[in-house]
């Protein structure tokens, strides 16, 4: 899997940053992604045993007040699975999806894509990620993919990036991310040192049943 990551990193190496879309990432969703990732890759666990994680993200999509760009409002993250490789799609998790959709129906939210971790690999989309993202966008063209690497994450770096395929389904673009309060994400990590000091191999986060 590491070899695939290294060989396919060029898929997003030249990705341009979108000026037509902006992600507002709510703190609850961001921290859920962090917790899930650190459950299976942290300083207490042998690096050879680090695992990737995957989950869904949900929220709403709207236009800004000037109607010049879209706002992808990610309000919640849904931990789903972990393993040596995560390439699952919505179709693989019908039972989990039913639980999520029941909850989302009460809030007028929808599935906006997925998140996954690259423990020590860096922030990009691999060939496997490309195929997964393509399947999401065929169902919902605004779907995005979030990638998190805890080895990059720090008090001045969010360790997370967002990607989406352009209409040609061959080229990725980066979607800028801000905290939901409008501040840059780098200014919204007050609990970084708490996370790093407290995370250990005993932390458990609930994943939805498949």
Placement of each model-derived feature along the sequence:
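MPN/JAMM (Mov34/JAB) isopeptidase/deubiquitinase module and associated MPN-bearing subunits/adaptors
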Residues: 1-113, 117-210
